[in-house]
Amino acid sequence: MRRMRGKSILAVMLSFSMLGGVLSAGGEIKNASAEMATETPEFGTQIITEDMLNTTPDKDYKVDMSMQGDAKDGDYNKYFLDDDVQTVKINIDENNLMYMFQNASDKPQVMTNQVTIGDETIGYAGLKTKGSYTLENMPYGNSRFSLTLNFGKYIKKKKYGATQNFHGLSKVSFNNFYFDKSMLKEFCAWKVLSKMGIPTPQVGLAKIYINDKYYGVYFMVENMDSSILEQYKKVDKSEIGDYLVKPEYYRMEYNTAMDQFINAEGDFDLSEHLKKNENGDYEASEALHNAIGGLWEYDNDTLQDVAKMIPTVLKWQKKLNQLYNGTDFSGKKIDVNSDEYVKLLDQVIDVDEVVRYYATHSFLVQTDDMFTGEKNFAVYVDKNGKSMMLPWDYDLSMGCFYPTTASATANFKITQMYDPERNDFGYNEEEGYSQYPLFYVIYQNKSLMNKFKKYMKDCSKIAALGGTLSTGETIEPGYINSCIEKIQDKLQAAATMPLTSGGRYINASQPADMKKALPSIKKIYAMRSVGVVSQVDGINATVCGSGCDLSAVGNGQPDRFISMRGKMAIVDEKTGIFAVNTYLGGFAASLTATKLTQDSEQYKTIQSNVQLDAGCNAVEMYSLSAVGSPIDKYTVYVPTASKYKNTNLVLYNYKKDGSTEKVSTKKDDNVYYGEVSELGTLVLATTSKVENKTNTNTTVKKDQAVKGKTYTVKGVKYKVTANGTKRTVTLVKPTSKNKKSITIGKTVTIKGQSFQITAIAANAFAKNKKLKKAVIGASVKTIGAKVFYQAKKLKSLVVKSKKLTKVGKNALKGIQKKAVIKVPSSKLKKYKKLFKNKGQKKTVKIKK
């Protein structure tokens, strides 16, 4: 959480008044809370001292090994819910709790008795307050602090046989929504970050109970820890380097004074400047401390964590700064737009990941960042001296720090990640970025900035417009809107529950404020998506922010006046449909797009009256209406679902007078667009049949296989997953476990139709005690969890498929220890990674 600066003297005075502050006759601001604390404690009935705390776990406590895990397996992910609010119950000695509350600003660690998350209970986790601005500005007597749980703080390997974790999770935090009336700002931001393939923590929402008293809803987030990278890279903790920090010195410019520590071999020799004291802790010499700057947080614990990595990090920093200055590693000038530059840069940073990070960060308009002097990011440098960027702290995303209004946020320049009025950035973008090597090494290369823009468009697809991402993943339109709608009712119910005495939501009246914020947080994601696409694709329309109030979301401002002049875009947040037109002035404009269901009377009426070309079939209809008075034709943009990915669609406009206007239709990925004379009902039509269970033009004959049903063919059960233009099935399981050999073909014939076998269901051949050989056909793309679990005699597995993308957890656990897996030679390297750590013994071989 950032340390926020006051905007005016009045705001400061009001803030202190709200917090219990008083202004003395001499103008000195005093804290009434502190004075009151000398008479009676802010929390509890007496002052709690350290000697009154319970700090020792039961000596006979046993670590529940069934709850211990490796972060790489992601077993704890299921406790961070997508469509519900998790329940977290903390049982703690009352003295420990009051001590933590009474000393909240010092963030003391206290011991809990037990913590229950969902249906799992774990003993003796550490608990502490967290934050900076939130702690400094908590209203007097309010106990709704942000919190962190540390599962292994008191249960260490030396005493208890294992350093305790929660299914692989070491620490989890609970943020109190200080700047977020919607309670969904960070939740949505992390959805976009995760979909963009950036290493991100697990997140969710949680109801917190402490000693059976309800403290309300919190944002639940995995701590910035190696567990994030272990899961992202699918590796053991031992393979992750120790340098994962939120650096104090956010610019990361190399200090040439560090050259004094370089030895003849070109390495940094810190043996005389980084030594252990009598307590076994590392200490840095004054010379090293002065030269090194803020490469890590200014605390002793972090120094101990990163000490061994410092020489590697310094070498990384020097190389980064050489490229930033336009030279190679020998100091020779280099063309920053050359292939050689990118190759050298890829030795220093994970180029693709870093570009993705900055593109997503820019899309989210999170200007409370390194470019405004804050630390809300992390840097990871691996053991080989190559770095990644990890995002952090998005409670002020979507313009709620700067530029603060919906119109300004939606149209925020895609390469601007800063407030031009803060620090020394000024209004010269290139000059400003040139002081930040971490980004400037990307910014100064044209091809990388083109990739940056492509990834920003990917963010628009994720947030609202749908389509195929650069990774090949397909996203449905309205993704963020659907994420919100899945959880909003559960969230509202949790926010409605009365809080314990002394617990109050800060800067919000819940659940009223959350409910009020919902339309605006949905709209801002759709508006920003269109604003980015408008810039990247050269549409050059200004998105109208009408109907979106960022002050309702939290910490933003309403649009006081929206000038409807020039080329403007209006957008519907639910469908992602947007329209562009020219305006000469007038009131703010907005768009509403209502999808008509095929069984509605309106749909049936239009279907019977709309005049389509011969052979065209209507598949979807959207009734459009708008506020505003444009002077030209509308250009409408219609994002379509993935089921139309391989289908050519055309647009028709059913006008208010009952006539039909055929639209000259163009296509960009999944978005169809064209000009219409007025906004009526848009009809999407196709000349081919589309796999669509609600499409009346697609019928299934009685003698055909039915999607969703299971059929048995030659002793094997198959479930039909598609029976349209494409026909696919999942192999469920054989009817008998007595077969010694099984061959999964490329296709299977069901009711006279040929279906591709594209998947093998979980547990399909589990505990088959006679199976010795299995052949996986050429169409299989996914192998489910525990497919060959405890098939103890399985010694030969032949994979013919070159399309395999996923192998489930423990798919090979318990197969013969000397088993051989044969794969296509062209896929050997990829499939070795794919089959890695699927439960098999290390003696199992994978070869071509």
Predicted features and spans:
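Middle-to-C-terminal accessory/interaction subdomains
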Residues: G44-P57, S66, N96, S285-T372, ...
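Internal "kinase-insert"/substrate-recognition segments embedded within catalytic cores
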Residues: I155-K156, N176, G197-P201, K213-A359, ...
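Proteolytic processing hotspots in large secreted/extracellular or virion-associated proteins
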Residues: S600-V650, K655-K656, S688-K689
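C-terminal beta-strand-rich structural cap/linker in extracellular carbohydrate-active enzymes
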Residues: V671-N692
